[in-house]
Each structure stands twice: as C-alpha cells, then as structure tokens.
Amino acid sequence: MAAQSKQAKPSGKQGGKKIIATNRKARHNYSIIEVFEAGVALQGTEVKSLRERHASLVDAFATVDDGEVWLRNLHIPEYLHGTWTNHEPRRNRKLLLHRRQIDTLFGKIREGNFALVPLSMYFLDGKVKVELALARGKHAHDKRQDLARRDAQREVIRELGRRAKGMG
C-alpha cells in the first residue's frame, strides 16, 4: 500500500478573501442593482500599503471614460517604508474588467440614473479585487423606510427569541 504524502498547509487564507476595506455607507446611500468584481491596476507601494490594510473607500466612485473604467477618489496612504518611489494617495486607478462588462456598465449608466460605487476591496489569491456595484441613489424617505423596516425585523426576531426561551 502506497503512503500518501502530506504537505503542510500554508498559513493564512490562501484561497479565500482577505478583506482590506469596506464601504459601509454605500449600502445606506444607494440601492444596489448589480454587483461586479474587478481587478485593480496598482503600483508596488500601493500593494504594500494595502497589505497593511490601509485604504479608504468612503468617497470613492468609478467612471467609464473612453471604454475604460477608472476608480476615482480611492485613498491609499503612502507606504510608510517607501522612498522616492512612493505613490500619490488619491490618484485615479484603472479597473480591470472584461469588454462585455464595461459595455454593459456603460449602457446602463447612460440610460438611467446609476452610479458605480465600490462596496469592498480585498485580496483574492494574492490579487487586489474591488467589489463594484451598479447602484441608484436613495432619497431621504427611502433611507428612513429601510431603517424602519430593519428595526421592525430586528424586533420580530427579538420577540421570537423571547418566546422560545419562555420569557414572553
């Protein structure tokens, strides 16, 4: 009987997502229509800074210019140990998508009031990816309705838990 060779598993999440930053305000301010995954063209010091989980998606958005998708206003601070090769923190970064996806996004943005908003940024198999959402902006009353719906749902779950425990 042949012995099976066992290899040591590498530490860390090799096949999974390692989240760098999330845009929590995006789901509050926008109703998400469709979600895409895009790669990001970065410089070396940007990747090093992202490995330390330094990034802010708060004011970031994406645009389609000349058949290319650009991520604007994403803040990646300068790498602490970088030298003169350090990057500019708020430069425009190219997003890597398939041509069909870019054409779909461009068509939907042109026909309706849609925005491209980054939801999260993460490492996937050593590559930086952005979860990009095709979204429509919410009005103040929409936000209030969502909050009321969420509170009501939370109260129902709380009450069911009390009844299950025999308290209510």
Curated annotation (Swiss-Prot):
Family: Belongs to the SmpB family.
Cellular component terms (Gene Ontology): cytosol
Record keyword Cytoplasm present: yes
Highest taxon above the source species: Bacteria
Protein's recorded name: SsrA-binding protein
Biological process terms in GO annotation: trans-translation
Molecular function, one GO term: RNA binding
Protein species of origin: Mycobacterium ulcerans (strain Agy99)
Lineage: Bacteria, Bacillati, Actinomycetota, Actinomycetes, Mycobacteriales
Major location category of this protein: cytoplasm
Subcellular location: Cytoplasm
Keyword line: Cytoplasm, RNA-binding
UniProt region (Disordered), positions on chain: 1-20
Function text: Required for rescue of stalled ribosomes mediated by trans-translation. Binds to transfer-messenger RNA (tmRNA), required for stable association of tmRNA with ribosomes. tmRNA and SmpB together mimic tRNA shape, replacing the anticodon stem-loop with SmpB. tmRNA is encoded by the ssrA gene; the 2 termini fold to resemble tRNA(Ala) and it encodes a 'tag peptide', a short internal open reading frame. During trans-translation Ala-aminoacylated tmRNA acts like a tRNA, entering the A-site of stalled ribosomes, displacing the stalled mRNA.
